[in-house]
Amino acid sequence: MNLNSIPAFDDNYIWVLNDEAGRCLIVDPGDAEPVLNAIAANNWQPEAIFLTHHHHDHVGGVKELVKKFPQIVVYGPQETQDKGTTQVVKDSETAFVLGHEFSVIATPGHTLGHICYFSKPYLFCGDTLFSGGCGRLFEGTPSQMYQSIKKLSALPDDTLVCCAHEYTLSNMKFALSILPHDLSINDYYRKVKELRAKNQITLPVILKNERQINVFLRTEDIDLINVINEETLLQQPEERFAWLRSKKDRF
């Protein structure tokens, strides 16, 4: 299996998995044009589309792709049923694509119906988990998002986190504002800054490393707890997550 990223809009990534036979899976095609160009350039045969949630920058290209390749099966949560989804999937169900079984994980928060797809080592997490951050809460609550990213953080160490946006640099600037002396965060920030200066992608990331540099995954970390306690005493990891999300919204 080969993992490919296709840039779209200002900072989106459309992920494509292809096998040796050229069959491919497309994840969150917000725009059809760059996907069609990549399909033509690589001689891929699209087999399926995965949708994580209903936002236009993730579903906008579905209808054009299905029109061009009517054999495509479009998997998605209930909230994408009017966006071209032909196979609605929900938590704990599986999608069998390219000879691999993908587990569906419900991750409400960014939207109420948001889902992720996992087949070792690939995690397609849409706008739930970003490198160094997590998605904004357009529909869900901090409690829901905390539980969602906790699920994702429990996946195997070698999981490849395939986020849908290039937000890593801004996320790491926020992380530094919270834990300015953290060695892992500082090292990763420098690496990301160099990559972005060359207009290079920072994704995917390895989950084991992400747990070290993503403050939203470190709500039980004593260094973070001490920082938060300087401002307010919060007893539960869930409360500390909500504090971080509120700070990030205003950053």
Curated annotation (Swiss-Prot):
Its EC number is 3.1.2.6. Zn(2+) 1 binds at residues 53, 55, 110, 127. Keywords: Hydrolase, Metal-binding, Zinc. InterPro entries: Clx_II_MBL, Glyoxalase_II_hydrolase, HAGH_C, Hydroxyacylglutathione_Hdrlase, Metallo-B-lactamas, RibonucZ/Hydroxyglut_hydro. It is an enzyme of class 3 (hydrolase). It catalyses: an S-(2-hydroxyacyl)glutathione + H2O = a 2-hydroxy carboxylate + glutathione + H(+). Its cofactor is Zn(2+). SUPFAM superfamilies: Metallo-hydrolase/oxidoreductase. The keyword Protein biosynthesis does not apply. Binds 2 Zn(2+) ions per subunit. GO terms for biological process: methylglyoxal catabolic process to D-lactate via S-lactoyl-glutathione. Pathway: Secondary metabolite metabolism; methylglyoxal degradation; (R)-lactate from methylglyoxal: step 2/2. Zn(2+) 2 binds at residues 57-58, 127, 165. HAMAP family: Glyoxalase_2. PANTHER family: HYDROXYACYLGLUTATHIONE HYDROLASE (PTHR43705), HYDROXYACYLGLUTATHIONE HYDROLASE GLOB (PTHR43705:SF1). Thiolesterase that catalyzes the hydrolysis of S-D-lactoyl-glutathione to form glutathione and D-lactic acid. Belongs to the metallo-beta-lactamase superfamily. Glyoxalase II family. This is Hydroxyacylglutathione hydrolase.
